[in-house]
Amino acid sequence: MYKVLIVDDEPIICEGLRKSVKWEKHNCEVAGTASNGLEGLEQMKVLHPDILITDISMNNMDGLAMVAAIRSEYPDIEVCLLTGYRNFEYAQRASLG
């Protein structure tokens, strides 16, 4: 099974993603959640997820900074960025390939 890490500072988003997606149908499981990029980095070290779903705008460390920090150590991780920003150029700064 693929392990998924969800990082968002809105608990309702984390819980909604956990409950609304039929993870097992896609051979996935939500291995953990975090409420900011710093917590996400710590969870990465413990869980070694295959897929990261993260908000862009969070306190302490935003999603873009977290993705930049993990890219060298986890080059094969699949990343999905969540954003409420209308201007997609902000999300493109993540340089996701």
Predicted regions and their residues:
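Hydrophobic/aromatic residues located in beta-strands of well-ordered beta-sheets
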Residues: 30-31, 79
